[in-house]
From Swiss-Prot:
Keyword rRNA processing applies: yes
Signal peptide: none
Subunit structure: Component of the small ribosomal subunit. Mature ribosomes consist of a small (40S) and a large (60S) subunit. The 40S subunit contains about 33 different proteins and 1 molecule of RNA (18S). The 60S subunit contains about 49 different proteins and 3 molecules of RNA (25S, 5.8S and 5S).
UniProt keyword annotation of rRNA processing present: yes
Intracellular or extracellular location(s): Cytoplasm
Top-rank taxon: Eukaryota
Pfam families in the cross-refs: Ribosomal_S21e
GO CC, alphabetical: cytosolic small ribosomal subunit
Protein name: Small ribosomal subunit protein eS21
Main location class: cytoplasm
GO molecular function, a single term: structural constituent of ribosome
Keywords, sorted A to Z: Cytoplasm, Ribonucleoprotein, Ribosomal protein, rRNA processing
Protein family membership: Belongs to the eukaryotic ribosomal protein eS21 family.
Length: 87
């Protein structure tokens, strides 16, 4: 929620799992948030430019985190031609 000045006043802002679109609960201690930096042509990270993925504990517990990361990275153009079992 925002106040009349436009500042965020919530103590907890829920996240959504990037793989399943489920809301990650506050007590989900198995969830992770991964930032992947954008790089320039020299291979150096560009400050302030990154892509954020949040994975819930449910996805990680099922062993689907690596496949989900590959799928999301392919969709965002970070990876090309990664083999997937679901194809």
């Amino acid at each position: 929620m925002e106040n009349d000045k436009g500042q965020l006043v919530e103590l907890y802002v829920p996240r959504k799992c990037s793989a399943t679109n489920r809301i990650i609960k506050a007590k989900d201690h198995g969830s992770v948030q991964i930032n992947i930096a954008q790089v320039d042509e020299n291979g150096h990270a560009v400050p302030g430019e990154y892509i954020t993925y949040a994975l819930s504990g449910y996805v990680r517990a099922r062993g689907e985190a690596d496949d989900s990361m590959n799928r999301l990275a392919q969709k965002d153009g970070l990876l090309k031609n990664v083999w997937s079992y679901s194809r």
